Design a protein with these regions (language model features):
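Post-HEXXH active-site segment of zinc metalloproteases
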Residues: 31-36, 66-108, 129-137
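An active-site-proximal "capping" alpha-helix that borders the catalytic cofactor pocket
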Residues: 106-122
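A metal-dependent hydrolase signature that marks the N-terminal structural subdomain at the beginning
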Residues: 1-27, 167-182
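Short pre-active-site segment immediately N-terminal to the catalytic Zn-binding motif
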Residues: 5, 40-55
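Hydrophobic (often cysteine-bearing) scaffold residues that line and stabilize catalytic clefts
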Residues: 10, 53, 108
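Short secondary-structure capping/junction motifs at helix and strand boundaries
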Residues: 120-131
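Active-site recognition of the HExxH zinc-binding catalytic motif
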Residues: 54-68
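Pan-zinc metallopeptidase signature
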Residues: 129-192
Length: 192
């Protein structure tokens, strides 16, 4: 049997997974944003029925790694939401090792890529469907290789944010196995 990439059944499987972990996802014909076929809309994901599975995973990853208290800021171009999140954090007196501070500085594109890979592996998808060769400026194959070798930089960011371990030890499994799928850490009540 030949595996087919980007089938409706696989896309539905990914969307169901995202909804189950708390990332709201819905179909919307013509949805498009920073990536073709997918739009981040105030912390939710709108997906065109023909969108690549890899795109759904990656854009969903951006929402999953963003702390829940800031997800609604993520809308369209993520950079504006991330800048606002950093501005808010700058007004607090949190120590850089505070869990929220650590989470905020670890939700960039490499972490989203590593998260998407882990989610795709969890769902049993082949590597060339999780990250396509023509993605990442044509470097998809190289990024896939780095992920397969567990040497991709985003893995370290996920570990720093608490999502996973870098290496197996003391009975803890390592990435791509995750301790949790969404960043739930919130603003401490004493933060100003």
């Amino acid at each position: 049997m030949n595996y087919r990439i980007d089938t409706p059944g696989t896309r539905e499987k990914v969307m169901r997974f995202l909804n189950e972990i708390g990332i709201p996802v819905r179909y919307e014909i013509g949805a498009t944003g920073f990536t073709e076929g997918c739009r981040i809309d105030h912390g939710m994901l709108a997906v065109d029925p023909a969108c690549r599975v890899s795109t759904v995973l990656h854009e969903g990853a951006h929402l999953a790694i963003t702390p829940r208290c800031f997800r609604a800021l993520m809308n369209g171009n993520l950079f504006a939401g991330q800048r606002e999140m950093l501005r808010i954090m700058g007004e607090t007196d949190l120590h850089p090792d505070d869990p929220l501070y650590r989470a905020v500085i670890q939700c960039s594109d490499p972490e989203a890529t590593a998260w998407a890979w882990a989610a795709g592996i969890e769902l049993g998808l082949p590597g060339d469907e999780i990250i396509r060769d023509d993605e990442y400026g044509g470097d998809g194959e190289e990024i896939r290789l780095a992920l397969q070798m567990r040497s991709y930089i985003g893995v370290h960011g996920l570990a720093h944010a608490g999502f996973c371990e870098i290496r197996e030890r003391n009975g803890m499994v390592a990435w791509p196995h995750m301790k949790f799928w969404t960043q739930e850490v919130g603003m401490p009540e004493t933060a100003s």
